[in-house]
Every structure is written in C-alpha cells, then in structure tokens.
C-alpha cells in the first residue's frame, strides 16, 4: 500500500477508488476565511483534493479568534488568508494550498473546478459569479453563518443521477414465455419473490429461442402479477420459446439541473423539491433583507435600535412587495427575524462546524457529477 493509499484508506473504503481519484484532481477556490470558511478549508484539505486556494484580505480582529481556530491574539491586524494559510499547509502535504493576492474572482475562475463563497458580498456580484460558474460548468456554493442561522445555496449545473436510491440491480430467471398480441413472461420465483412493478423497465437476456426479444432494448412492464408480467409487444410470429433467460431491471437515470441564484432568489415559490415551513420562509426573507441592508450600508447591522429599525423596514418593504408572490404564505414573525439581525455579525463556532460539515459533504457530492 502506497503512502497516499494508507493516508486515505478510510475514504477509499467509504467512497471507492474512482471517487477518490476524482477528489485528488479537484481544484477549489474559497472566498472568506472566518469561522465557516476555515472549517470548510480544513475539512476539504484533509479529504485530499489537488489544490485549495483561499482569499480573505481583511485584517484579523479580536472577534475572529472566537471562530477561526487557527488564529492567535498575536495575529490581530494581519491579513486573514496570509496568516491562516500557514496552518492549513500543515494539514496535508499532498495538497497544494495557497492564497490569492487580489479578489478578481472572475479572472481566476477558469483555474478552478469549484468556487465557494463563505462571506457576504453584494448580491449582484454573487449572482454574476454564479452565472459565470453555471455557464462554464463550474461548481458554485454560497454559504453564510448569521449567528445561530446557517444558509447554503448550491449550483452544480446539469447532471445525471445514476441509481438515485443506490439499489442493487434486480435479476430474475425466466420460466416460460407465452406468445401473443401482448407477450407474457413467467418468472421462476421458487427461490426469490418477483418485486418489480408496473411501469418499470426490463431488458431480456440469454433466452433460447425467441431471438427477436434479444435486441437489448428496454421493455415496459404491464399487468404485473406475483409470478408473471406482460410487455406490449406482439410476439405472435416470433420464434418459439425453448428455455431459460433472464429478466434484468433497468435502473433509470434521472437528469437534474440546478437553477441559478438569480432565478432561485424567490426560492419558496419556485423550488420543486421542498414545501417550506413558515419559519423557513421567514429565514429566506431575512436572507434577502440582510443582503439589501449590506448593499446599502456596506456592512451587516449592529445590534443597535437604529440599525435594527432600518433592516426591519427593509424586511417589511420586501414582504409587502412580494405579498402576492412567494410571500403570500408567510406569517411575518418580526421577533424571530429581529433575533437573526441582532447576531448577524457573529459567526458562532459550533454553527460554523455544522455548516462546514454540510458544505464539505456537498463538495464530495460534486465529484460524483464529474
């Protein structure tokens, strides 16, 4: 066993050699190295990609020491990424780690497979970066921690899911085939129950006789019983069935295309996969309000009454504007939203740890799409 195989032995056992090879070729750019960004960086460097680049040219403050576990008091005033990279380099000698000198993310995108933004920025720029990633088939993740709240938006473009339920392909032995306007296939279920359902597809193999059924085409099951089913195929003039054969389940691939943030900004109205609760709708409203406040003030709100009143007015404006759209199902919970705003500047370490785990798992999912 080589050194790298020994280092990643548990991952290889969990994901398989093919997935580990994909991870080892991945190049990731991470914007924002506070609590959430450092958790993501740490997790993914330990997973063994080819390259991880970070960017955060903000100066380290005393507040950063509460969430970025690589920083010390003596680092206050230094640049976040330049200081953090020293410790990140120690995590895994097989991963190239560096930091960008400038924040021209648009120019650097072509060098990476995946862009992760873990720091709030102008929502218009976020949407432009997302669009650039979408058009160029790059992965995109935008994730934020506001106090006790964690947000994550993922866009991995168009992809195919193979075997969505990870089921083992089912096969059954053929006992007999009856010719007719509809072809009836009898299953030998002496040792195994027949568990396929009407509407599913099968391929027929290794039949002696009836060579017309051995064309490799998938056929739809109809009139399914416990030991037989039919296919809509006129076999009246086919060769006679002699013996044997296998019915093999066809596991259909599912095509999914992630939507861009610009379209999904009205998520509760357009998302096909969830039925959001009132609390989740209020969270989304808070997410939009925080971005509008940030765009207008170049900062997140303080816990002062002045800032809280400003952002609550923004929230009411967005709510009223979309009352006939996605906000029609929201019972506005001002106290709940106000608590989010009070602590929006804070990145609480346990929440960052949780969020970092979620994002890291999304990155592992991404390699399955390549």
Positions of PLM-derived features:
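Adenine nucleotide-associated cytosolic modules
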Residues: 1-370
């Amino acid at each position: 066993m080589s050194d790298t195989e020994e280092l990643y032995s548990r991952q290889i056992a969990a994901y398989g050699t093919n997935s580990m090879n994909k991870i080892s070729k991945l190049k990731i750019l991470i914007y924002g190295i506070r609590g959430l960004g450092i958790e993501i960086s740490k997790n993914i460097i330990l997973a063994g990609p080819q390259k991880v680049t970070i960017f955060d040219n903000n100066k380290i403050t005393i507040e950063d020491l509460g969430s970025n576990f690589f920083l010390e008091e003596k680092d206050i005033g230094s640049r976040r990424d330049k200081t953090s990279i020293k410790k990140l380099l120690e995590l895994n000698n097989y991963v190239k780690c560096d930091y960008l000198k400038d924040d021209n993310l648009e120019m650097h995108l072509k060098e990476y497979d995946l862009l992760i933004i873990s720091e709030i920025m102008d929502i218009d720029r976020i949407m432009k970066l997302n669009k650039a990633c979408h058009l160029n088939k790059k992965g995109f993740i935008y994730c934020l921690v506001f106090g006790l709240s964690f947000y994550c938006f993922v866009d991995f473009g168009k992809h195919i899911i193979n075997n969505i339920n990870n089921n083992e392909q089912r096969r059954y032995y053929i006992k007999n085939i009856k010719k007719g306007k509809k072809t009836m296939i009898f299953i030998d279920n002496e040792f195994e129950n027949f568990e396929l359902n009407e509407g599913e597809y099968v391929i027929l193999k290794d039949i002696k006789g009836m060579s017309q059924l051995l064309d490799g085409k998938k056929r739809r099951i109809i009139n399914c019983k416990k030991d037989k089913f039919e296919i809509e195929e006129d076999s009246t003039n086919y060769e006679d069935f002699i013996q044997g054969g296998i019915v093999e389940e066809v596991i259909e691939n599912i095509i999914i295309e992630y939507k861009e943030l610009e379209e999904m900004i009205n998520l509760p109205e357009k998302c096909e996969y969830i039925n959001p609760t009132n609390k989740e709708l209020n969270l989304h409203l808070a997410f939009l309000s925080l971005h509008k406040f940030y765009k207008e003030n170049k900062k997140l709100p303080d816990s002062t009454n002045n800032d809280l009143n400003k952002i609550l007015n923004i929230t009411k404006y967005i709510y009223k504007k979309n009352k006939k759209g996605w906000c029609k199902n929201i019972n506005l919970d001002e106290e709940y939203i106000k608590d989010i705003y009070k602590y929006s500047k804070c990145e609480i370490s346990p929440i960052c740890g949780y969020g970092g785990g979620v994002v890291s798992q999304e990155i592992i999912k991404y390699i399955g799409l390549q």
